[in-house]
Amino acid sequence: MERYAFRYRYDVTSTVYTFTDKPATVTHTHTASGKDSRTEAYTYSYDHADRLSKVEHTLGGAKVTLAAYAYDNLGRLQSKSLHGSDADRQAYAYNVRGWLTGISGTKFTQNLYYNTGNGPAKYNGSISSMTWKAGTASTVRGYKSTYDGLDRLLNATYGETAGISTNANRFSENVTGYDKNGNIKGLQRYGQTGASAYGLLDNLTFTLNGNQLSRVEDAVSTAAYGTNTAFVNGASAAGEYAYDVNGNLTKDLNKGITDIQYNLSLIHISEPTRP
């Protein structure tokens, strides 16, 4: 089965589908007045279980592999290779319950712990602790997590090395409480405050009207350092945030925005316009 879609400027897109209605080949032909046409194609391959196994791109007669996927006997993603190179391969590991426990590759490595690791043991699928390392970096970074009685995140305690104990709290985050609707009432964020100094960047208190945020106050005036970001407490008023009847944000005094107007786009999504 083949379908065609025509667009302005003489672009033609054709799609060939498999018998299970998945795209097998998507071909784009680009034409313009006075120019030679250009055709590119994406080819999708599937394994015996109809799972995506390879994505290839063809342009000017040259075909390259964009991605290749392999699955284990339980149908879980086992590995992913990008750009036809094992150098960009990532492997995935799971525990007996099917929960993801690790991602390993040359560009990024991550380990997730539930009832093992350095955080309080969790047996319901919530992450107790996690560690990661980017590329060839020697530093292993991680977080230990704690939860309240309703299994809502309370603390994400930062640390380095496999034990998540070195340089503790440099980038920790703490939720100070929840309201009866499950909205957070306060948030503390730590980060870099100087060339070699770390400390509390934000100590935020949230005021809500129902489930809509109406005010944010920050008890810390310390500015973030370098590329770190901290909340900018640009106002101190009862109604720092306002909304229209559809729930769209119409005012954000902390960013100096006093009025946001919306129109209705062709795809029925409200788009903000600055007056």
Question: Model features per residue range: what roles?
Answer:
Residues 1-270, 274:
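Acidic/glycine-rich beta-solenoid
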